[in-house]
Structure formats: C-alpha cells, structure tokens
Amino acid sequence: MLRSTCCTPLCPFTAKQPSFLRKQQRITSDRFTFRGGGGGDAAAVVSSSGLRDLVFVVNPQGANGRTAKEWKKLLPHLRSRLGKDCNVSELLTSGPSHAIDITREAIRDGADAVIAVGGDGTLHEVVNGFFWEGKPVGYLSGEASRSTALGLIPLGTGSDFARTFGWNNDPCEAVERIARGMRSRIDVGVIDKEGKDLHYFINVADVHLSAKAGFYASKYKKFGNLCYVIGALQAFMGHHNQDMRIRVNGGEWEIYPQVTALCVGNAKYFGGGMKITPNAIPGNGNLEVVVLQNFKWYDFVLKLHKLYNGTHLSVNNVTSRSVQSIEVEEITDSGSIYVQSDGEHLGFLPRKFQVLPGAIDIIS
C-alpha cells in the first residue's frame, strides 16, 4: 500500500546528541560524496527537485496493532512539519521480511532516506534491506554521490536501539530529527554461517540463553515489555550452560567453559532496556562482546539490576572485550544453541560475527 503526500514547525527539539554523533552535517540542496570511516562523518543528498524523498516503512501489526494507531495519529504532524522540504511515501508491511524488500526497492529508486516506523524488529528488517548478497544496495542510476540514510520512529514493543542514542519513544521528537536532516555514519554488524546466510544487525546479536529467551519472548509480544520476562522464564526451563570455542579477529581458538550467554553489541541495550554491552559505540569500528559464564537462575535474580544499569562487567564470571570479528562454535555439536540478532531468531551455532565500519548513515 502506497500513499504519497507532501508533509512545517511542530515541537522544538534540542536534545543533546551522544558524543559519537557530533560530526554531522545538515541535508541541503547540494550533493556530497561520503568520505569513509566509522566515526560519524556526515553528508547529504536530496532529489533534483530540491525536496527530500522520504520513504516511511510502517509495520501496522507492531506492538499488537498499537503502531498502526499511533502512526495514524502522527501523520498530520508529519505533513505539518515536513511539507516544505520533503516528499513522503508511506508503505505498510504485510508480513515477515516485507520491510526488507520495500527498503531495497526504495534505495534502488533513489530515496534520500528510509525510515523504520515500529520497534526493533521493523528496524532490523529495514537495515537488512540496505544490503543484497553481501553488498550495499545501490541507486540504480549508478550515481556515486547518491546515498540513502536510515531513520527511525520508535513505535513498537521494543525500542532498545533508540536507547543508545538517548532517544525517547516520542514520535514528535523523531519527526523533528527527520526535519533537521542531520546524518551520522554508524557501523553495522554482519553474521554468517561458514561464509553463507549473511544477516545484518544494528543493535545486539546474542547466543544461547538470551537468544533462546528472545525466541520465546517473540511469542508473547501482546503483553508488551512483559514478554521479555515471560521469555526469560521459559528459556530457563531445561537450560544448561555450554562449553564453547571462540576465535577473535582470526586469531587462535579459545575455550570458554560453561557459557550462559554471549552477546555481541554494536549498540548497548536489548531485552526491553537491559544495558548488556555498555561499552558498545555504534560508530567506533568495533563490536563489544560480553560473555556470561556459569550463571544460575538465582544469579540473574540477584544481579538483574546490574544487567539493567550496565554495571555487570564488574561481576565474577562476566568478561568483555572489543573485537572486529568473533567466531563462535559449540564443542558438543548438539546444534541446539540459539542465535538471534536484534530480537530475530537466526537458527543455531556455529556463527561468525563481524563489524562493517561506517556502513550506514543514520538520521540523528
């Protein structure tokens, strides 16, 4: 479903930006080429008419249907705030993976930005739409200076990615970010299985208990953020810590005994606000890996507050390291250790995780 509209000021927004996003440049009527790096270099592209072409990818089923209702309320604000500067296309997803296809088509058609409207799941699909067969999707005209930015209006069950940037779940603020038109370059993670089945993530990927909990949580999204608690309780039933083999940056294999969960963060939060990879910065060219070992159910109960406020790195049996790539295998080869990224179930180990520095520009 496609609705095209032209969509001026609503509510002033002056929130402080994270330090890793300070190198920015406003979108103007000029065209710029990007200058590489993962540190937040900024640039801008608009259509030949001088108006920005924005594609909003909306998941109407998000948050048990709440996304569709909130989006309908937001549309008048979009038209009011953005009318002088942009052309807006609204595209509603019809099912799983549809946002990926919509995004690829929009980029090939030369959109200046694709904005995910929904939760982390919708954002995850839109990010994957920026890539095809291991390469960035390009504008079909071959125009080297043309680059599509990623945007976000958080209206879903979970908005963990937005937390890293200090963004509230306020659609008015999101519209103001889009109106300002500032771009910053950020990293993206990519996951593969023996060189195949490439999958991209922008927030956090994880292995074993947390991934299993996320798998179960997805079945209870009608309960809102409570779904994460229900998923964790269900995942604990029959859970066993596992010995794993890990290789960092192509080096020697290391044995990690009794792994409870392994998390690979491009950003900081997952699971409805848990600051699991607190040192992750999505523009520094690295991923943060946090490993929890030999945790029992009561460890989570006693240390849950530390996991949420990001102080768990000082806890025994918790380690953290910065990597460009990490390969993870289970030693027993049971084929039953869950893998997920940005809350989406990807299957089971083995997997390789690596960073793509400065892979996407985000409206910030």
From Swiss-Prot:
Gene Ontology biological-process entries: phospholipid biosynthetic process; phytosphingosine metabolic process; response to cold
Keyword DNA-binding assigned: no
Domain annotation DAGKc: ranges: 49-195
GO molecular function: ATP binding; D-erythro-sphingosine kinase activity
E.C. number(s) listed in UniProt: 2.7.-.-
Pfam families: DAGK_cat, YegS_C
Alphabetical list of PROSITE patterns matching this protein: DAGK (PS50146)
Main location: mitochondrion
Positions contributing to substrate binding: 118-121
One GO term describing the cellular component: membrane
4Fe-4S found in the keyword field: no
SUPFAM superfamilies, A to Z: NAD kinase/diacylglycerol kinase-like (SSF111331)
InterPro entries: ATP-NAD_kinase_N (IPR017438), Diacylglycerol/lipid_kinase (IPR005218), Diacylglycerol_kinase_cat_dom (IPR001206), Lipid_Phosphate_FormReg (IPR050187), NAD/diacylglycerol_kinase_sf (IPR016064), YegS/DAGK_C (IPR045540)
Top-level taxon of the source organism: Eukaryota
Xref: Gene3D superfamilies: 2.60.200.40, Probable inorganic polyphosphate/atp-NAD kinase, domain 1
Keyword terms, alphabetized: ATP-binding, Kinase, Mitochondrion, Nucleotide-binding, Stress response, Transferase, Transit peptide
Binding sites annotated in the UniProt record for ATP: 59-61, 93, 125, 156-158, 342-344
Subcellular location: Mitochondrion
Disulfide-bond pairs as recorded: none
Active-site residues (renumbered): 120
PANTHER family on file: SPHINGOSINE KINASE, SPHINGOSINE KINASE RELATED PROTEIN
Biological role: Involved in the production of sphingoid long-chain base (LCB). Is required for the cold-induced accumulation of phytosphingosine-phosphate, the regulation of the cold-responsive MPK6 and reduction of root growth at moderate low temperature.
Protein name in UniProt: Sphingoid long-chain bases kinase 2, mitochondrial
Organism field: Arabidopsis thaliana (Mouse-ear cress)
